[in-house]
Swiss-Prot record:
Membrane-protein topology: Multi-pass membrane protein
GO cellular component, one term: plasma membrane
Descriptive protein name: Phosphatidylglycerol--prolipoprotein diacylglyceryl transferase
Record carries keyword Transferase: yes
Annotated metabolic or biological route of this protein: Protein modification; lipoprotein biosynthesis (diacylglyceryl transfer)
Gene designation per UniProt: lgt
Length: 274
């Protein structure tokens, strides 16, 4: 077996198996796995912060309802030139095509509503969800691998991703191997997960919002770099949308941490948890 630093990644295809008209796809299975594992992690973390695990389970339903449709809507809007001609594909989420920034926005809105209804701190919930979110992102990126999508520029590095001719951009139709950006981001996200869990357990009295803000900064730094390698970025004119949003995420995260620790003030919040 070749070591990882000399690895050629080749997708076996997007489908796990097919029975008649029923198709089980890797993308859907990975999303489901990310939700289940993330839920279990957040439930476990909640026991350290005097939050009922059942409240986290209830929150998870809200997050799924808010995040997944918004993730798809975000993607479709920035690919409207294509989807306006293929309206029947707008809802085919199992084929791929969701945007994590849309999921984050939808999830935050759902969590804000939930926190007001439950009368708990929004930022306390955000701190419990952030490690699960980045874990889910690390898992979900492998869906891009199986779909042969979200890859980088052509490369001849020892580690590379083979892309079938039908999935290659026209500009690179004669190139077979590309940067495995799915792997870069998955590994980066796992490192961010380690940072967040270390903060959670080493600094149990950290101010509310700290872990989520650190997530915003660290994830966005990685995405800012990795997005520059990709060939299929969502664009708005000459701008890569994900890089613009990542810069905003870094800025908001740094401002929030400055507010908490340099100005020594609390973040605006819903009703504080007891």
């Amino acid at each position: 077996m070749l070591p990882l630093y000399w690895a050629v990644f080749t997708s076996p295809g997007p489908e796990i198996f097919r029975v008649g008209s029923v198709v089980i796809r890797w993308y859907g299975v990975l999303i489901a796995a990310a939700i289940v594992l993330g839920l279990q992690l957040s439930r476990h973390l909640a026991t350290y912060r005097r939050i009922k695990p059942d409240d986290i389970s209830d929150l998870a339903i809200w997050l799924v309802i808010g995040a997944i449709p918004c993730a798809r809507l975000y993607y479709v809007l920035f690919q409207w030139e294509y989807y306006s001609q293929h309206l029947d594909q707008v809802a085919t989420i199992w084929r791929g095509g969701i945007a994590i920034h849309g999921a984050i926005l939808g999830g935050m809105l759902a969590a804000l509503i939930f926190s007001r209804l439950k009368k708990v701190s929004f930022w306390q919930l955000a701190d419990l969800v952030a490690p699960s979110l980045i874990l889910g992102q690390a898992i979900g990126r492998w869906g891009n691998f199986f779909n042969s999508e979200a890859f980088g520029d052509p490369t001849d590095l020892p580690w590379k991703l083979f892309i079938p001719p039908a999935r290659r951009p026209l500009a690179y139709r004669n190139s077979a191997y590309f940067h495995p950006t799915f792997l870069y981001e998955s590994v980066w996200n796992l490192m961010v997960l380690g940072i967040l869990l270390a903060l959670f357990f080493k600094f149990p009295k950290a101010k509310k919002g700290t872990i989520f803000l650190v997530y915003a900064v660290t994830y966005s730094l990685g995405r800012l770099w990795i997005e520059g390698l990709r060939t299929d970025s969502l664009m708005l004119g000459p701008l890569r949308i994900a890089q613009v949003v990542s810069l905003i995420g870094i800025g908001i995260g740094m401002l929030g941490l400055t507010w908490l620790y340099l100005l020594k003030r609390s973040l605006p919040d819903t009703k504080q948890a007891s």
